[in-house]
Amino acid sequence: MKRMMLCTLIGAATVTLTACKKDEVFNSLPDFLVSDVRQFDYDGNTDDLLTAGLGPEGLASATPPAFVDALNPTPAELRRLAIYNNYRALVDTAPGGGYGSLFGPAVGNASGRIPGQEFIAMMQVPGATVPVTVMAQVPDSFDPDFPCMVTAPSSGSRGIYGAIGTAGEWGLKKGCAVVYTDKGTGTGAHNLATNTAQSVNGTLTMEPEEALFRADLDAQSRDDFNSQWPDRFAWKHAHSKQNPEADWGRHVLQSIEFGFYMLNTLHGRELGNGETLRTINPRNTLVIASSVSNGGGASVRAAEQDEKGLIDGVAVSEPNVNPAVDRSFSIRQGNGPALTEHSRSLLDYTTALAVYQGCANQAPGIRDLAPLNGMFNPPATGQNICHSLFNKGLVSGATKDDWALDAQRILNEDFGVQPEQNLLAPVHFGLAVAQSIAMTYANAYGRAGVEDRVCGLSLAATGSAGAVVPLAPAAEASLFAASNGIPPSAGVNLVYDNAEGQPTSLAVSASPSSSQVDYGLDALLCLRSLAEGRDVVTGEPLEGAQAELHEAISRGISAVRASGDLQRKPTVFVTGRADAILPINHTSRPYVGLNQAVEGRHSNLRYYEILNAHHLDVLNGFPGIGDRYVPLHHYYFQALDLMWARLTDKQPLPPSQVVRTVPRGSLTTPLTLANLPPIQSEPAEADRIVFTGNQLQIPD
C-alpha cells in the first residue's frame, strides 16, 4: 500500500499549502462534470450495489426481474434489469460452470449482497460535445485508512453497469471503491420517429438536456430523414460523431478523479471553513485499472496516458487494444511460421470476418462440428454467401466446399486468425458480432452521422419477414436495461436500406448485385472497402465521398492506437487463445511485443494466455461450448488477485506463460479447480512466453 504523503502542513489552527495546487489539497467538484451528482444509498437487503437486491439466486435465475408497468418502468426497475442483464452477459451463471463455487457474488461473501452508496453523473473530455456517464460505488466495507479503488469501464459498447459482474464484483468484495464509465457508448438510442431518448436513469425523455444522446439533427432535418427512412434509430456509439474510443483512456482517468472526489465527500476532513481536506488521494490509495474487452483496452490506454500518477497497476482480461504497428518484431507460436503482419486494426479484421465468415461456416470440418452453427446460421444463406464471393472473384475453387475452405484459409492465413478460433467463429457470426462491430466502428471512426447511412445501413426494428416496423413501446421503454449498446440488440436490428426489394434486416437481405439472400454481402463488402481504401471487388481505389470517408476512418483508427508505453506500471493481461472476437495476433500478443520494444527491460507487463478459453464466457452454458472451454473469468479474477498481492505485499508477478486448462468434457460434469490449473509462479520452461531476438515466442 502506498504511504500517505499529504502535500499539507497541518498546524493547530491553520493549513499551510506547500508545493501543491489548492484543488489537489481541498476537495472540489471536478470541472469535467456537466450534470449534478445523483446519490443513492443501498442497504444490502432490499437493494444493493452488486445484485440490485436480486442476490446470487436472482442473478442466476432464467427469469428476469419484471416491471410493474411495462410502458413506464421506474429508474429502480431499470437499474435492476440492467444489472441482471449485464452481469449475465459477461459471466456464465449456468449450473456446473463455476458460478457459486469458483466465482459469483456469494463466493467469499455469504449473502452476495453489498450495501453502500452509488454516485452517478455526466462528464465530458475537452473538445467533446456528447456527455459520458460516470459512476462511483462505495461499499460500506470501504476503509478510509487503507483506501483502494478499481476502475470498471464498460465492456463492449455497454452502458454504465457493463462491468458490474467483472471488475465491479471483484472490487466491491475487496472493499474498494469501484469507478465505472460507459466510455461514451451505452444504449443512447434516439428514436428519430418519436424523438424520445434515454435519460441518465434509463427512463425515456424528450428533453434534449436530459438525454444520454441525441442525433445532431434540427427539426427540419429530422422530419426530412423520417419521411424517407421512417422508424430509424440513431445510436450513441455509432452516431455521436465523437469517435469515443479515442478518449476511452481519458474517460477512465476522469472516472478515477470522480472517485476521489466522492470518497473525500464521504471521508475527507472538514476544516470548519467550508473546505474539506482531501485525505484520500492518489498518494495513499491503491488504484488498479481493470475490466475486460473494450473496458480492458480503455484501462490500458488510461495507464499509457496517466500523467498524474493516478494508477498503480493494471489487470485486464481480453483487452481490445489496437497496438501501434511495429514491424520490427514478429510473433511465433511453437514451431509455426513467424507472423509479421500482426496488429491489424479492429475494423480491418472485423470487416474481413464479416465478409468471409458466413461462407467459412460451411467448410467441411466446420459446418457440422462448430457449436450452434446450424442453429444460428441457415446453410442456404451461407451457401449463397459463398456463391456471391466466388462470382466476385474473392474465393476460388470448383465446388461450394472449395469456396468455403478458401474463405477459411483467407481468414487464417491472410488475416492471422488462429485456428483455435475457427470453431467459435460461426456462432459469433450467427450473433452478428463482426457485422455489428463493422457497422458501428466504421461510423464511429469516420465520425459519421445517422443521416449518412454508411454503406446503406441503418438501425430499426424489423418484422418476421425482415421489413422495418416501429419498435414496440414496451421494448423501447426497456432499452436502457436490455440493450448491449451495439445493435442488433434488444429488438433493434441492422437494416440494409439498399437491399433488393425494400429495406430489410441485414441477416435476411438480398444484395442488389446477386439477387440472393447473402446476408447483404454488398453492404459488408462496402464496409470492407472503407477499411482498405479500395473497392475490394474491382481493386480500384475509392473515389469521392467514399474516399473521403476512408480517410476519416483512417484518422479515427490512428487516434485509438495504443503506444505500448505502460510507464513501467505493473500490468497483467489474461487472454483466451480461442478468442474469436478479438483475434490475439492483432490485440494482446502484439501489444506485448510492442511493450517490449518500447519499454524493454523496464517492462512490468505479464501476459497469460489461457488454452481452451475464449471471449464470451456466457456461451459456456450451451452444449458444444461449455464441454470444450473453460471460463476466462476465473483467470481474470486470479490476475486481479496477483496484482493485489504485487501492490500490497510486493509479491512478484509470475512470468508470462501459457496456462494449460482441462475442459470438463460434459455439461453434466461440474467444473472444478482440477480443470483450472493456477497461473504458476515458476512455470515450466515449455510453458513460458518470452521475447527474444525481436520475436514474441509462445508455446503451442
From Swiss-Prot:
Any one Gene Ontology molecular-function term assigned to this protein's record: hydroxybutyrate-dimer hydrolase activity
Pathway assigned to this chain's UniProt record: Lipid metabolism; butanoate metabolism
Segment forming the signal sequence: 1-21
GO CC field: extracellular space
Major location category of this protein: secreted
Keywords assigned by UniProt, alphabetized: Hydrolase, Secreted, Signal
Protein EC: 3.1.1.22
Catalytic reaction(s) noted: (3R)-hydroxybutanoate dimer + H2O = 2 (R)-3-hydroxybutanoate + H(+)
Domain of life: Bacteria
Keyword Signal: yes
Function: Participates in the degradation of poly-3-hydroxybutyrate (PHB). It works downstream of poly(3-hydroxybutyrate) depolymerase, hydrolyzing D(-)-3-hydroxybutyrate oligomers of various length (3HB-oligomers) into 3HB-monomers.
Similarity remark: Belongs to the D-(-)-3-hydroxybutyrate oligomer hydrolase family.
Name of the protein described by the UniProt record: D-(-)-3-hydroxybutyrate oligomer hydrolase
Native organism: Marinobacter nauticus (strain ATCC 700491 / DSM 11845 / VT8) (Marinobacter aquaeolei)
